[in-house]
């Protein structure tokens, strides 16, 4: 039996990137901190960024990003957000 893969999206603000294949994306963490980065357009759907859930605890979700955040050098490929910021595609 195989597990069904569901796409998970993070609510964010999307604007035009520097190149035709990317968009500038800004988002908030669970504490209201502001973060941004440039992400491939293939990772964006209806103004939301496709992410992977790494961990969940109560109403918080640690998500992996399909790229790096500008404000977090090194380990900027994940962010903790509120569950209400996440949409799971059926």
Stretches found by the model and what they are:
Residues 3-86:
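Basic/aromatic-rich interaction segments and small domains that mediate binding to polyanionic partners
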């Amino acid at each position: 039996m195989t597990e069904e893969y569901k796409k998970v999206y993070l609510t964010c603000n999307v604007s035009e990137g520097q190149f035709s294949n990317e968009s500038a994306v800004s988002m908030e963490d669970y504490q209201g901190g502001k973060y941004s980065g440039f992400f491939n357009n293939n990772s964006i759907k209806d103004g939301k960024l496709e992410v992977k859930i790494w961990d969940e605890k109560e109403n918080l979700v640690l998500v992996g990003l399909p790229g790096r955040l500008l404000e977090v050098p090194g380990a900027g490929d994940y962010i903790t957000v509120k569950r209400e910021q996440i949409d799971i595609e059926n």
